[in-house]
Regions:
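Membrane-interfacial terminal anchoring regions of lipid-handling membrane enzymes
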Residues: 2-26, 32-173
């Protein structure tokens, strides 16, 4: 646990250094791994890690990063058949675990597989909205920042016909 905390702090310090001193952009995933249902949500733990490197109050530390949420949506999920296969194996084979080869196949398919139309959209920097959260207790603060980032990402999504079909199927309409 201590080693993981030290590693997170080192990563956070480097991200702050890269942005504030080297004037570089950093793209970081909002969560570890991928959600099987593609409903990715920002993990509070990612924000806690990012806040570690600022060396002061959480809001100031996050504002220093000039966070700009970005949405990436595509028409087809190239990994859909792999996700379905994994879900079926988990259902049918007790104790099933994906192998490292399975993970590599998923990554390769996700990167190079056919996606149809692809849409990328950035929102505006959320610094002003972060300022409005100043004063919240830490226990609530990270959850609210996660919700804020998710809201901006969801507003940037482009929906394709398959999304509407899936919604109809889920709602039984």
């Amino acid at each position: 646990m201590r080693q993981m905390l030290e590693s997170s702090a080192r990563m956070s310090r480097y991200i702050h250094f890269a942005i504030t001193q080297k004037h570089e952009n950093v793209w970081i995933a909002q969560r570890e791994g991928r959600a099987k249902d593609s409903n990715d949500r920002t993990q509070d733990s990612v924000l806690k890690m990012l806040a570690m490197g600022g060396g002061r109050d959480v809001i100031d530390s996050l504002k220093e990063l000039n966070i700009v949420p970005a949405a990436l949506s595509y028409e087809y999920d190239p990994c859909d058949f792999l996700k379905a296969q994994e879900m079926q194996l988990k259902r049918d084979v007790e104790g099933f675990k994906k192998s490292q080869a399975d993970d590599l196949m998923n990554m390769q398919t996700g990167i190079f597989g056919y996606k149809g139309h692809v849409h990328f959209q950035t929102s505006t920097c959320i610094n002003d909205e972060l300022e409005a959260l100043r004063g919240l207790p830490k226990t609530e603060l990270f959850a609210r920042v996660s919700e804020l980032i998710d809201k901006h990402i969801h507003l940037g999504y482009r929906l394709y016909p398959g999304n509407y079909v899936a919604c109809d199927l889920l709602q039984g309409s």
